Each structure stands twice: as C-alpha cells, then as structure tokens.
Curated annotation (Swiss-Prot):
3',5'-cyclic AMP 1 binds at residues 130-261. PANTHER family: CAMP-DEPENDENT PROTEIN KINASE REGULATORY CHAIN, CAMP-DEPENDENT PROTEIN KINASE TYPE I REGULATORY SUBUNIT-RELATED. Residues 1-81 are annotated as: Disordered. It holds the Pfam family cNMP_binding. GO terms for molecular function: cAMP binding; cAMP-dependent protein kinase inhibitor activity; protein kinase A catalytic subunit binding. 3',5'-cyclic AMP 2 binds at residues 262-383. It comes from Pyricularia oryzae (strain 70-15 / ATCC MYA-4617 / FGSC 8958) (Rice blast fungus). Belongs to the cAMP-dependent kinase regulatory chain family. This is cAMP-dependent protein kinase regulatory subunit. CDD domains: CAP_ED.
C-alpha cells in the first residue's frame, strides 16, 4: 500500500509529525514495505484500558467490520477522509540488513535531552514489554533516538483508529484522551470517535506495537488540552538499533565460542544457535558469580570486566578472567560441584548458557565430546576450568 493511501489524521490542523514521506525515509539498505489485500480480516485482542498512566498496545484493529465504502475523489489533490477505513491492512514490516552486510554508515539518530527528560523517558519505557529486555547500550540509543513532537492545540489526533501505525509515543507533558469505535475504525461525524475509554497522562505511552509491525491502530488518541509534548520513535529506527546491536553481539559471542575447547568443532549454524541462547547478566564488583561447592549448571563468557577464581584454603586467586575468557564450560558435561568460586573484581557483564538450554538446542553433549575427543583430555582440565573438581 503506498503512503498516499493514508490521510493525515490532523485534518485542517498543521501536522507536527511531518509528511508520510518524511516519516518513512530512512537511510540505509532498507527494502520497501510490501502489503497485500487479504481475503480474511485481521482481528485484534481485546484491549484493557487504565487511567491514569494508561498504556495500551495500539497495534491492531477489528478489520472484520467494514467501514463506509471508499472511492477515489474527483479532484486529484487528495483522497477523501474515509478512503482508508474500508480497506483491510495486512501486518508487515520492513526488511532490514545488518551493516556488516551492507556498506552503509548508518548511525542511530540522536536528539539532545536534559537529564530530567532522560530520567522521565527512561521510567516511561522501562515497564513496557518491548523495552524490558534491552541492555544499557540499546536503551541509551533508544532514548537518544526519541524525537520531540509538540502538540500545540487541543483535539489534535495523534493516531487514528484503523490507520496504519509506525510510531510509538511517550507523553512528557499534557493529557491525551483515548477513543474506541466498535466498528474497528474511526467514523465520520461527531460520534465517529466512539467511546472514551481512557486518558494518558505524563509518563504514559502508547502505540508500542507499531514498533514491531505495520498493523491498524486499535484506538484514536487525541490531545485533551493545548501545549502537550510527546516524544516519538519510529519502527525502522527501533528495529535497526536492535538489529545492529544484536548482530554485533552475536558475532562477538560466536568468536568467543570458537575458543572454548569442547565447542571448538561446532558448525557456524550451531554456534549461531548457542549465541542466540546466551543470556546477558551484569554483576557489580565483589559479587560471587559462582560459589564453590554449588552444582555446575551454567557456562559463562566474560563480555567485559575482570573476575577472579578462588579456592578454599588459598588466599590468592587461582586465575584471573578478562574480556573474552570463559569459565564453567564443564557444567555442560555434568553436574559435579564447583571446585572454586568466581568473584567479580570489577563490574562485569557475562553471557550465560545453562546445560538444559544447550541440550535443548543441540541435543546431548556426548556426540560433541566425541567430535572434539574431549574424553581423552585428562591433563590440563583444571587449567581450562579450575571451577571443576578433578
């Protein structure tokens, strides 16, 4: 569906969000969005509205209910206000390519913010399911990419029920009313907005499902007072930030995994599966990451920082771990108790993999041991993993 198929929800008011072309233009090797008319309508789950601090995933609408018929206008200047309401919009998303495979120099957009604004925005997004798994670097990039959108007047429609969505919004100032029409789309006339179901105030957010795919909005959100302020993030920027950081991290993990003796013969595909399953954990200085005597359950890659291994009865550390080192790999083979403790010397970030996750992805470890002939290695095991008893 072309961008011209969407009518601005702002009507006679000036549109502070820019033209569709401006909003959708992103540098980099981004493929066009392909949308199709579908034989069956796309439904959406019921939405629970709360006030104040209301958040709702405005990403889907009830396409089974047909809106008023649409037709092309007689004049060539634009489409009628109801043109898009009768159309069923498929769920789609842009095809993006990592920078390592495309020779562009894309960098995340950055819009300066005060310390107070950053704190409010961070609190607004940290409880949202789309942002809960982000690491510090990704969160900083997301916060930097949010762009300010002043809403100067009352009754300006920010999103319109039934329209395709591509922006997520955080409210910094003002109030916004939420309306839902039972037909699934906003209708013409004074009653076309539907029922008022909630109010979004400062610190609230809406439209998060637009960051995942291009689906019809499930509600209309409009300013309830003048001089409101929103911060907006578009889907392409969000997905690009996540894709680039995830791609870089996976490549780093795969390089680390190549250095692990019992995993050295994994294929590239197997390493990529393991890399995707690694879970990032952070520990402040002085934290016991692994305790001597505990059963060996997890294998760790050290992303950054330093950690030390200690054994009971020995005052000095038996080993120092730095970025790129690994420990606890024999936990993938058995559940024997740890023979040493690992304590973070500085703040550390590790990537952890449990034995159960490893077996779920690649099956039993024994075939891999046969591949590497790890059973035959009897000497030097303590040097490779001082956490495992001899």
């Amino acid at each position: 569906m072309s961008a011209s198929g969407f009518t601005s929800p702002f009507g006679a008011n000036s549109n502070p969000f820019g033209s569709p072309e401006e909003r959708r233009g992103v540098a980099g090797s981004i493929q066009p969005v392909l949308e199709e008319e579908e034989a069956d309508g796309i439904g959406s789950e019921p939405i629970s509205f709360k006030s104040p601090g209301f958040r709702a995933p405005f990403g889907g609408g009830d396409a089974n209910s047909e809106g008023p018929p649409s037709s092309r206008p007689q004049n060539p200047d634009g489409y009628p206000a109801q043109y898009n309401f009768a159309r069923r919009t498929s769920v789609s998303a842009e095809s993006l390519k990592p920078i390592a495979d495309s020779y562009d120099n894309w960098t995340p957009p950055f819009h300066p913010k005060s310390a107070e604004q950053l704190d409010r925005l961070k609190k607004a997004i940290q409880g949202n399911f789309l942002f809960s798994h982000l690491d510090d670097e990704q969160s900083a990039q997301i916060l930097g990419a949010l762009v300010e959108k002043p809403i100067p007047a009352k009754d300006i429609k920010v999103i319109v029920q039934g329209d395709a969505g591509d922006y997520f919004y955080v409210v910094e100032k003002g109030k916004f009313s939420v309306h839902v029409n039972s037909s699934g789309v906003m209708q013409a006339g004074t009653q076309g907005l539907g029922d008022h179901v909630g109010t979004i105030e400062a610190g609230g957010s809406f439209g998060e499902l637009a960051l995942m795919y291009n689906a019809p909005r499930a509600a209309t959100v409009m300013s309830a007072e003048p001089n409101c302020v929103l911060w907006a993030l578009d889907r392409v920027t969000f997905r690009r930030i996540l894709m680039e950081s995830t791609f870089s991290r996976r490549r780093m993990y795969e390089n680390f995994l190549e250095e692990v003796p019992i995993l050295s013969t994994l294929t590239a595909y197997e390493r990529s599966k393991i890399a995707d399953a690694l879970e990032t954990q952070k520990y402040p200085p002085g934290t016991v990451v692994i305790k001597e005597g505990d059963p060996g359950e997890d294998f760790y890659l050290l992303e950054c920082g330093e950690a030390e291994a200690f054994k009971a009865g020995i005052d000095q550390p038996v080993k120092l771990y730095k970025k790129g080192d690994f420990f606890g790999e024999l936990a993938l083979l058995n559940d024997a108790p740890r023979a040493a403790s690992v304590v973070s010397k500085t703040e550390v970030k590790v990537a952890a993999l449990g034995k159960s996750a490893f077996q779920r992805l690649l099956g039993p470890v024994e075939p891999i041991m046969r591949r590497t002939r790890y059973d035959a290695i009897k000497t030097g095991v303590e040097e490779m993993d001082p956490l495992q008893a001899a």
